[in-house]
Structures are given as structure tokens and as C-alpha cells.
């Protein structure tokens, strides 16, 4: 029995498989780029807030700001904005922190809608390829009249099904990648929320 490699199967899927290949490359790029960006934004220093507390207790605002800039995480950028508002009403400091936090979250979520679209759209594109292939197979069957070659018909059908397999594969991988990144972002969000509460406690202690 003849065996086909994955590459040979993909080549039989026609132009739909080219579209799916492009989508898979885009999905991999987005996943790797976002993974690295989120990991950088979410680096956790357990002693970060202790250092900030010490600097502010000693009224060393400049060192606190420099420490935030050198740490360069989402939480650090948020705390830096809060420090720059110190001396103003607590509500204004809180608003500044929340606005910066929202910007950081939006930055981490950049391109995720594209990944979600690929996760949902790739299976549909694959199914479209299958429908097109089935239409072509039955068109050939109708033109053959009474001289139907079952082997040719079955060959056309299995080639049509290849695009559904390809679409599902790309969609499933993209879906897992999307959910993984969302979970990573949720972890960073929880971290920056905890640090923002700690910072507001520090501000209250200094009043």
C-alpha cells in the first residue's frame, strides 16, 4: 500500500493549503513575539516593592524612579508613574496607576486578536477547500456519465478532505497558543494589581 508523507498530502490540497501555511507562519510569529514580550513585561522581582518602600521612606524619589526604569517591567512602569504623582491626592495617584496599567495590558494583548482570528478562521478556510474539492469531484463524476472511475472519485474526495485536516491542525494549534498567552497575561495582570495595592499602602503610610 502506498504511503504519503505529510508534505505530499499538503501538496495535494491545492491553493487552500498555501493559505493555511501562511496563516500558520503568522500564528507562530505572533506566538513567539508575544511570548517574549509578555515574559519581559512580567519578570517578577520579589523584593521590588520592598526596595521601593525603603527608597520612599528615605524620601529618595530619584533612586526609586531610577530603580523602576532599570527594572523595566509592566509593574515597574506603573509604579514609576505613581511615584511621579506623589504629593498629589491619592485619587489622582490611583488614576495614574490604573491608566498606566491599562496601557500595559493593551500592549501585552497586541496582535492577540489576529491569533484568535486564525484559530477560528483556519478551520473554516479548510472546510471551504473541502467543499470546493467535493464540488469538483462530483462535477467530474457528472461529466463522466456512465464511465465513472471509483478510484479517481475517491482520490478527488480524499484530496478535498486534506484541507479540512490542515485547517483544523492550524486552528487547534493557534487556539492553544492564544489561550496560553491569555493565561500568561492574566498572571502579569494579577501581579501588577497586587503591586499597585502595595504601592497605595506605601503612599498612605507616608501621609
Go through each PLM region and give its residues.
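Alpha-helical membrane-interface segments at transmembrane helix boundaries
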Residues: 4-13, 98-119, 150-162
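Residue-level signature of catalytic and energy-coupling elements of molecular machines
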Residues: 14, 28, 64, 79, ...
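Alpha-helical transmembrane segments of integral membrane proteins
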Residues: 17-30, 116-123, 170-174
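Predominantly long cytosolic amphipathic alpha-helical stalk/bundle segments
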Residues: 42-128, 132-144, 176-207
Amino acid at each position: 500500500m502506498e504511503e504519503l508523507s505529510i508534505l505530499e498530502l499538503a501538496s495535494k490540497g491545492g491553493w487552500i493549503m498555501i493559505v493555511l501555511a501562511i496563516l500558520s507562519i503568522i500564528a507562530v510569529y505572533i506566538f513567539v513575539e508575544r511570548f517574549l514580550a509578555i515574559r519581559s513585561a512580567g519578570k517578577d522581582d520579589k523584593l521590588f516593592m520592598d526596595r521601593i518602600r525603603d527608597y520612599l521612606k528615605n524620601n529618595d524619589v530619584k533612586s526609586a524612579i531610577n530603580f523602576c526604569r532599570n527594572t523595566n517591567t509592566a509593574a515597574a512602569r506603573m509604579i514609576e508613574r505613581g511615584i511621579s504623582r506623589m504629593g498629589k491626592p491619592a485619587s489622582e495617584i490611583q488614576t495614574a496607576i490604573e491608566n498606566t496599567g491599562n496601557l500595559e495590558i493593551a500592549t501585552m494583548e497586541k496582535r492577540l486578536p489576529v491569533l484568535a482570528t486564525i484559530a477560528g478562521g483556519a478551520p473554516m478556510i479548510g472546510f471551504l477547500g473541502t467543499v470546493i474539492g467535493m464540488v469538483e469531484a462530483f462535477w467530474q463524476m457528472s461529466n463522466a456519465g456512465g464511465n465513472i472511475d471509483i478510484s479517481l472519485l475517491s482520490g478527488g474526495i480524499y484530496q478535498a478532505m486534506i484541507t479540512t485536516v490542515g485547517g483544523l491542525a492550524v486552528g487547534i494549534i493557534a487556539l492553544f497558543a492564544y489561550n496560553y498567552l491569555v493565561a500568561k497575561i492574566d498572571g502579569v495582570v494579577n501581579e501588577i494589581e497586587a503591586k499597585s495595592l502595595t504601592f497605595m499602602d506605601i503612599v498612605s503610610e507616608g501621609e
